[in-house]
């Protein structure tokens, strides 16, 4: 594969992860995620040992979502984890993990920083996604953009500063809060995201040095 093909593939993974953190899975999205093309994608991604366990868990949950009730239960899991700000939730905002304040505010420093990154790239958060710019879905989508439009050094700098600096804390919180849910879909998604970011960071470091 050429570097262009590799970066395109990396961008696709970041965009996929972003989309799964951005909103609940509805029936239309489920069809996309369980299509023949998607199954091939999941299988290929799962060949890597560091991704195999979470990918297998994700595939199992998706393939078992055969009723409206099961889909609603997964949507309720998403809501309880990411939309309800309680101690039993895992808020997906960088500010809440990086701010030195005891009670960090949304739309804080990390939001302003991400807004500036988006502005510099002539991008913006879509109007149908009314969330602060430091939402994990926005950050992962922007990393996908960088994969195809920026040098390796710029990608690594953004990954270190805006993702790797807080992702492990977020993932630990997701796993802690998701433990009460039987299918563990979002624990697997969070685990896969962390493993992907760590592997991508290593690859970028090797490419630079």
UniProtKB/Swiss-Prot annotation:
Q: What SUPFAM superfamilies does the record point to?
A: TorD-like
State what this protein does. Involved in the biogenesis of TorA. Acts on TorA before the insertion of the molybdenum cofactor and, as a result, probably favors a conformation of the apoenzyme that is competent for acquiring the cofactor.
Q: Which family does it belong to?
A: Belongs to the TorD/DmsD family. TorD subfamily.
Give the transmembrane ranges. Answer: none
Q: Which domain of life is it from?
A: Bacteria
Keywords (alphabetical) are:
Chaperone, Cytoplasm
Recorded hits in NCBIfam families, A to Z, give: PRK04976.1
Which Pfam families does the UniProt entry name for this protein?
Answer: Nitrate_red_del (PF02613)
Please state where this protein is localized. Cytoplasm
What is the protein name stated in its UniProt record?
Chaperone protein TorD
At the highest ranks, the source species' classification is: Bacteria, Pseudomonadati, Pseudomonadota, Gammaproteobacteria, Alteromonadales
List this protein's GO terms for biological process: protein complex oligomerization; protein folding
One Gene Ontology term, aspect cellular component: cytoplasm
Species of provenance:
Shewanella sp. (strain MR-4)
Q: Does the keyword Magnesium apply?
A: no
